[in-house]
């Protein structure tokens, strides 16, 4: 009986030690919390400012992450073998990537921390870095990390790297090679890592949307049908305009970048009203905000009302930026994608 009690006591102590926060992680968390607290306090000053001058003043005092990046990196380097150092590497790689410490942390993802747990978000963020830098790191994590979230993130990010290579390819052979590699990685995410999420978003869902884009939204593909209603509830379809060149614009009143493009689109709609060219929008505001945007920017082309940036139409097109412009040929095939007004005008001879 006594030996059983001793055994149970040992197990309890072990559990308590295991549950105790890692000292390195706690030290890093304290630095991050201090920085984030100061940022929040400054943000509240901007929100509560009574005049534009006050807002400008407080915008000029937004705390820099530089000092905190230096502190976090020192803790990481002093405790490289501590599991809690992964938090510092993740934060530096995602929140301080523009500083030297952030660049060092990116390399750590593929070296000292390639087997660490808790770095999945930082690994996924490598999809946005140049492939020459990111690919060796992603492959190191994919091959050596024993944790499913990290392996899934590396596989997904590799898929996105090759997806972007495909989008940027200027010759058919390079495009097909990149497309094949992207599909291979995305299919692995869908089949092997179907349950993995990062920041609450299932990677398999993101991979599925991008595979759909590769298969159905590439230049030369026939654009999927769009069937919806405008803000007043009148229904119409993309196929109603077959026989005309169609410019698609995904936009919203909430989108500051759209504000400068909308007047140009209005001018283009006016200039082409007697030609076999039509501009159709996909608006991503809630109905009341959509009506306000139509008035504020005097929008003179018809738009489907999608309700949000994750509405049914927008989701199909797997958008990453706003505004997004497409040009479709009269037969419905995509001729330009993620393009700009100047390229559209040149293609149409305007």
Residue ranges of predicted features:
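Short solvent-exposed coil/turn linkers within tandem alpha-helical repeat scaffolds
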Residues: 75-85, 95-119, 125-132, 141-152, ...
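Conserved redox-active cysteine motifs that mediate thiol-disulfide chemistry
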Residues: 242, 250-267
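Structural microenvironment flanking redox-active thiols in thiol-disulfide oxidoreductases
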Residues: 259-298, 305-315
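N-proximal helix/coil linker or "cap" segments that precede and/or mark the start of modular domains
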Residues: 176-229, 239-242, 288, 292
């Amino acid at each position: 009986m006594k030996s059983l009690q001793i055994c149970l006591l040992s197990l309890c102590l072990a559990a308590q030690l295991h549950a105790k926060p890692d000292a390195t992680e706690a030290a890093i968390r304290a630095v991050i919390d201090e920085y984030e607290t100061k940022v929040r306090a400054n943000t509240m000053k901007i929100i509560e400012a009574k005049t534009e001058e006050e807002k400008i003043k407080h915008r000029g005092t937004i705390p820099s992450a530089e000092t905190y990046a230096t502190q976090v990196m020192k803790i990481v380097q002093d405790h490289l073998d501590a599991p809690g150092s992964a938090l510092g590497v993740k934060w530096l790689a995602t929140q301080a990537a523009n500083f030297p410490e952030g660049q060092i942390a990116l390399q750590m993802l593929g070296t000292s921390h390639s087997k660490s747990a808790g770095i999945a978000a930082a690994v996924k963020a490598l999809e946005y870095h140049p492939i020459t830098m990111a690919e060796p790191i992603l492959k190191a994590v994919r091959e050596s990390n024993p944790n499913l979230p990290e392996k899934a993130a590396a596989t997904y990010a590799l898929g996105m790297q090759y997806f972007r290579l495909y989008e940027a390819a200027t010759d058919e052979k390079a495009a097909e090679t990149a497309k094949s590699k992207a599909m291979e990685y995305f299919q692995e995410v869908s089949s092997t890592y179907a349950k993995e999420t990062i920041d609450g978003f299932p990677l398999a869902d993101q991979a599925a949307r991008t595979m759909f884009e590769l298969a159905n939204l590439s230049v030369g593909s026939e654009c999927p049908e769009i069937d919806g209603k405008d803000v007043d509830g009148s229904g119409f379809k993309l196929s109603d305009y077959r026989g005309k060149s169609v410019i698609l614009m995904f936009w919203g009143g909430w989108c500051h970048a759209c504000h400068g493009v909308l007047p140009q689109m209005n001018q283009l709609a006016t200039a082409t009203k007697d030609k076999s060219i039509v501009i159709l929008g996909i608006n991503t505001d809630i109905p009341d905000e959509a009506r306000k945007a139509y008035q504020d920017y005097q929008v003179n082309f018809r738009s489907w009302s999608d309700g949000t940036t994750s509405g049914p139409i927008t989701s199909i097109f797997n958008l990453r930026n706003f505004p997004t412009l497409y040009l479709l040929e009269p037969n419905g095939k995509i001729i330009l994608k993620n393009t700009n007004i100047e390229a559209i005008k040149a293609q149409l001879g305007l």
